[in-house]
Amino acid sequence: MTTSSMYSFCAMVALLVLVTVGGIGGCSGDRGGGPEEESATLTVLAASSLTNAFSELETAFEEQNPGLDVSTSFGSSSDLLVQIQQGAPADVFASADEAKMQTALEEGLVEESKIFAMNRPIVVVPKDNPAGIQVFRDLGEADAQLVLAEAKVPITEYAEDVLANADSEYGDGFGQRVLDKVVSREANVRASANRVALGEADATFLYASDVTDDVRDRVQTVEIPQNLNVLATYPIATIEGSQNAELARAWVDLVLGDEGQRVLERYAFQRVN
């Protein structure tokens, strides 16, 4: 065999080896079952009072959407609004009042909102009730130390509305006497609930939905008279610029639908349909 023929033969063998190896690699890839399923993360910003209900819905939504991870961040509605204003990546906003949502709407941060639940403000005291607060009116007379959420948190705004109503019932100055007993401001309703459950405060304003299993045995509820109370309304909206707009709208549909409403009702929210 000439030198030229030898080179040609070697080149042919090398080519056959490459084709064979490539073919094996290709077959091996085919046996892998095709491309892997892509995963996605849906970020929901929700008021603290929604923690239990939305955590349950999170599990249900993930089961309905394999490969999806729902990341739910709970906090005061005012803090969540600030996060959205500062450009935090998120897909859904669920607020404990309409004022925060209206601000988000006016600033073009969210799409059209819908009311999905209502809640009832209440007062809670420790189980042993050391200040002897038996009825709502006692808040103005008792030697008590109160905790309350920070000023812009919806529950505090609702509480202030209730106290303003109480002035007309119990006399001017009642509401201010109650506010004068506040010794600490908490980040959100859950923090306030824990302070009372631990016996670190004599009373606080919460929502009915905040008397959850982890505090129920350690607190008592003092109802606010119906003629003085207000109704907390909860709006929800998808966030403008969401990278998961279709999934975000599906989450909103879940919350507004029968399954979501049943879950919310189980956690002491009032359903809207």
Model-derived segments and spans:
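Periplasmic-binding protein-like
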Residues: 91-95
